[in-house]
Amino acid sequence: MSGALDVLQMKEEDVLKFLAAGTHLGGTNLDFQMEQYIYKRKSDGIYIINLKRTWEKLLLAARAIVAIENPADVSVISSRNTGQRAVLKFAAATGATPIAGRFTPGTFTNQIQAAFREPRLLVVTDPRADHQPLTEASYVNLPTIALCNTDSPLRYVDIAIPCNNKGAHSVGLMWWMLAREVRRMRGTISREHPWEVMPDLYFYRDPEEIEKEEQAAAEKAVTKEEFQGEWTAPAPEFTAAQPEVADWSEGVQVPSVPIQQFPTEDWSAQPATEDWSAAPTAQATEWVGATTEWS
């Protein structure tokens, strides 16, 4: 399929990406039309997809997309959550028209509704989940491309790309590979240099996980600010004026403070001490008119 050209052969880094994302892992069921894409069956019943056939079909699909003069005439669809982000990224990279989420019945056949469109090529993520657009495409003679698993029905599918269309990483990687090949065949990017866009941007992420990561990052930032605030607080400034000493051999002149003078008393001039042995002087106290004499 690649025409035996070295430039179109699958590179080692591409194989490693396929294996890391689990693109070669199919399901436990096998459709009779998908037998030609199977390499072997594991002991646990899972079918292994031949990545060489996957790469050949990927190049064929990219050539079909490039053959459309107006990129907006290519409709890419994914009703499943795992492929919606990848479809939007693919559309942004290639100029295609994305339909992420529920497909409105009659989009390709009912001319009355506002969402009516007439694309020239249709690309779907899962033939089983996206059966409605495939059926309508058959009514209007619309060529179709689909990412097919081992148990996917190939009815109304013109170009089937065998891969794992269940895993989020596998679906994102396949759309990334397809977008890269389309841009390469159009001459937008070079085959000699790697594409600067990472496959991670095409992967589906659970909104709950994203919210948890944002909360954890916010808490970590607050903790870091508090920690830095405790240790980086400015030291108190002492504004007391220090005496300037030009010559350190000379002593610092301490300002003299006058000593307060207190009057001194002559203890010798005090009167003689009373005789404590004498009886105290009688004092009269009135307690209910009575007097007490101390004798």
UniProtKB/Swiss-Prot annotation:
Region span, Disordered: 266-295
Record keywords, A-Z: Acetylation, Cell membrane, Cytoplasm, Host cell receptor for virus entry, Isopeptide bond, Membrane, Nucleus, Phosphoprotein, Receptor, Repeat, Ribonucleoprotein, Ribosomal protein, Ubl conjugation
InterPro entries: Ribosomal_uS2 (IPR001865), Ribosomal_uS2_C (IPR032281), Ribosomal_uS2_CS (IPR018130), Ribosomal_uS2_euk (IPR027498), Ribosomal_uS2_euk/arc (IPR005707), Ribosomal_uS2_flav_dom_sf (IPR023591), Ribosomal_uS2_vert (IPR027504)
Region described as Laminin-binding: 161-180, 205-229, 242-295
GO cellular component, one term: plasma membrane
Site feature Cleavage, where: A115, F116, P133, L134
Pfam families xrefs: 40S_SA_C (PF16122), Ribosomal_S2 (PF00318)
GO molecular function per UniProt: laminin binding; laminin receptor activity; structural constituent of ribosome; virus receptor activity
Primary location group: membrane
Positions of modified residues (N6-acetyllysine): K52, K89
Quaternary assembly: Monomer (37LRP) and homodimer (67LR). Component of the small ribosomal subunit. Mature ribosomes consist of a small (40S) and a large (60S) subunit. The 40S subunit contains about 33 different proteins and 1 molecule of RNA (18S). The 60S subunit contains about 49 different proteins and 3 molecules of RNA (28S, 5.8S and 5S). Interacts with RPS21. Interacts with several laminins including at least LAMB1. Interacts with MDK. The mature dimeric form interacts with PPP1R16B (via its fourth ankyrin repeat). Interacts with PPP1CA only in the presence of PPP1R16B.
Note: This protein appears to have acquired a second function as a laminin receptor specifically in the vertebrate lineage.
PANTHER family, sorted: 40S RIBOSOMAL PROTEIN SA
Family: Belongs to the universal ribosomal protein uS2 family.
Its biological purpose: Required for the assembly and/or stability of the 40S ribosomal subunit. Required for the processing of the 20S rRNA-precursor to mature 18S rRNA in a late step of the maturation of 40S ribosomal subunits. Also functions as a cell surface receptor for laminin. Plays a role in cell adhesion to the basement membrane and in the consequent activation of signaling transduction pathways. May play a role in cell fate determination and tissue morphogenesis. Also acts as a receptor for several other ligands, including the pathogenic prion protein, Sindbis virus, and bacteria.
Protein name as it appears in the record: Small ribosomal subunit protein uS2
Lineage of source species: Eukaryota, Metazoa, Chordata, Craniata, Vertebrata
